[in-house]
């Protein structure tokens, strides 16, 4: 399976959280926005401060995040992505989710291949389904 992966999926795996994506091992080619690096590392830093994680735990989780990101094809956030993300959407979508969705839409158009969208985010999954994506990770709406 070719899948666009957002930070919610990557973080549940890297942080060993409950309900990690069961389809993760089925992803043969993972695609993500370069935004995934910033989102993932900022989340880890917030967790470090809130949960007072020991340095060894932070280092281990950071290494896992970077390992997972290295396995993905990262799409840069350029003016084309930002312009697409700024366009009206069929459902309510926040700024970061709009960037993820625009990246997935542009990848699908440019590669002319189907791509599954992997997310645990409800709003992103609804918007992705409205754009004709098969979605894994989020409960059907």
Mark where each language-model region is:
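Acidic catalytic patch
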Residues: 67-91, 98-103
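Short glycine/serine- and small hydrophobic-enriched flexible loop segments
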Residues: 42-49, 105-106
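A short glycine/serine-rich beta->alpha loop
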Residues: 26-30, 87-93
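Acidic, PIN/NYN-like endoribonuclease modules and their adjacent C-terminal/linker elements
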Residues: 2, 33, 106-141
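Short beta-strand scaffold positions
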Residues: 5, 32, 76, 95-98, ...
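Anionic, Ser/Thr-rich low-complexity intrinsically disordered regions
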Residues: 22, 32, 45-48, 55-57, ...
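Alpha-helix capping/helix-boundary segments
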Residues: 10, 36, 81, 100, ...
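Short, well-structured N-terminal submotif of metal-dependent ribonuclease cores
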Residues: 1-37, 47-60, 139-141
């Amino acid at each position: 399976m070719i899948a666009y992966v957002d930070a919610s999926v990557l973080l549940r795996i890297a942080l060993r959280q409950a309900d990690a994506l069961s389809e993760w091992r089925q992803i043969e080619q993972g695609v993500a926005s370069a935004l995934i690096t910033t989102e993932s590392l900022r989340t880890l830093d917030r967790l470090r401060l809130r949960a007072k994680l020991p340095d060894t735990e932070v280092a281990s989780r950071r290494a896992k995040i970077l390992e997972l990101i290295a396995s993905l094809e990262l799409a840069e956030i350029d003016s084309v992505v930002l312009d697409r993300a700024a366009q009206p959407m069929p459902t309510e979508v926040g700024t970061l989710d709009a960037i993820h969705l625009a990246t997935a839409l542009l990848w699908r158009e440019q590669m002319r291949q189907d791509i599954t969208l992997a997310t645990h985010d409800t709003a992103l999954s609804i918007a992705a389904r409205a754009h004709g994506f098969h979605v894994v990770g989020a409960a059907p709406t």
